[in-house]
Amino acid sequence: MRVTLVVLLALFLALQYRLWFGKNSLPDYWRLQQEVSNQKNTNENLERRNQLIYADIEDLREGEDALEERARNELGMVKKDEVFFRLVPDRNP
């Protein structure tokens, strides 16, 4: 009986060691759960960003107003016989 108890205790301790310190232990599992959570957050942020970009692309494909606005703001284009004034803020207030 005593030998069986010692063997069972040794087996229990060996399993506990593997559970806490071995390969694929609980701390590894918790770390991987955190990494998965972080990756899900990153994916959600990128998905929102992609949706905004797709909406912008669709707006540019369908509407002339968005295309004209982008040409004016980003490229500085103006219509024929139009004068465009851009006010630049003073760097030293």
Curated annotation (Swiss-Prot):
GO terms for biological process: FtsZ-dependent cytokinesis. Residues 28-75 form a coiled coil. It is a single-pass type II membrane protein. InterPro entries: Cell_div_FtsB (IPR023081), FtsL/DivIC (IPR007060). Part of a complex composed of FtsB, FtsL and FtsQ. NCBIfam families: PRK00888.1. Essential cell division protein. May link together the upstream cell division proteins, which are predominantly cytoplasmic, with the downstream cell division proteins, which are predominantly periplasmic. This is Cell division protein FtsB. It comes from Idiomarina loihiensis (strain ATCC BAA-735 / DSM 15497 / L2-TR). The lineage of its organism: Bacteria, Pseudomonadati, Pseudomonadota, Gammaproteobacteria, Alteromonadales.
